[in-house]
Amino acid sequence: MNFGLEGKVAAVAASSSGLGKAVALALAREGASVALCSRSEKRVGAAMEDIRDLLAADGGKVPPLVALPVDLGSETGPDEFVSAAADALGPVDILVANNGGPPPGDAAGLGDEAWRLGFETTFRASQKLADAVIGGMRARGWGRIVFITSTSVKQPIAGLTISTAMRSAVVGFAKALSDEAAVDGVTVNTAAPGSTATARLEAIFAKRAEAGGVSLEEIKTEAEAIIPAGRFGRPEEFAAAVAFLCSEAASYITGLVLPVDGGLVRSLT
């Protein structure tokens, strides 16, 4: 299937590693020009070079890529990212609003600073990124926005209280925005990864193992056992789902929360 993304400009937030990097690679493989960003100039530059090398090794065309060091949790970071991406590649047609996620913690006893940081880096950054692109997308009559959240928006995950709360707020914002923008050819969706093999998942499991006094392998085995697919997801599997939501083929899909989780979430809606 041709996703119809050749010549489109994509801005993928928090894309120096993990799911963000996998999404950037998937969109570049479909022919989109891609702006990557991270707080670390070194890491985002290395990610861009990795993507370029992978595409070249596959024998495919390498679209324009740009690596931008930006702190999306700052007041001006989201606008800076979108502006710099547009300056380098052209107006942004596709936004993938990703972030590293707030630190884990139980509901009781989380301090004000933890909540403030969670709000700024998870909800506010995503909302600001969308605000920075939505006007241009609607004016041009085409656009794709995909917010990356978590299956916790469908089924809360113990120990990820701030993440669950803030990502659920992102879902509410995304649904409202999808209602407003659909008439102008802009789709707004949310992709909710389940247990996917990334460094963040490894860190969460390591914390659980330490707290429970058990081995990391025990935690991993228990986590895999409750997934109907019987294994953790791969970043490229998640990225393929996001690329589809960004495609011409998904032009009539908007306001959706799509779990990419191997069947982990048991809810009917």
Where are these regions (language model features)?
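Conserved glycine-rich cofactor-binding loop
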Residues: V9, A14-G18
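Short, small/polar-rich loop/turn modules that mediate ligand/substrate recognition or access, typified
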Residues: V96, A182, T187, I253-G255
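Substrate-binding pocket helix/loop in short-chain dehydrogenase/reductase
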Residues: D106-F119, I145, A223
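Alpha-helical segment proximal to the catalytic Tyr-Lys
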Residues: G135, D179-E180, S251
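Catalytic loop of short-chain dehydrogenase/reductase
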Residues: V146-A169, A174-V183, S195-T196
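Short C-terminal tail/terminal secondary-structure segment
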Residues: Q155, R231, A243, T254-T269
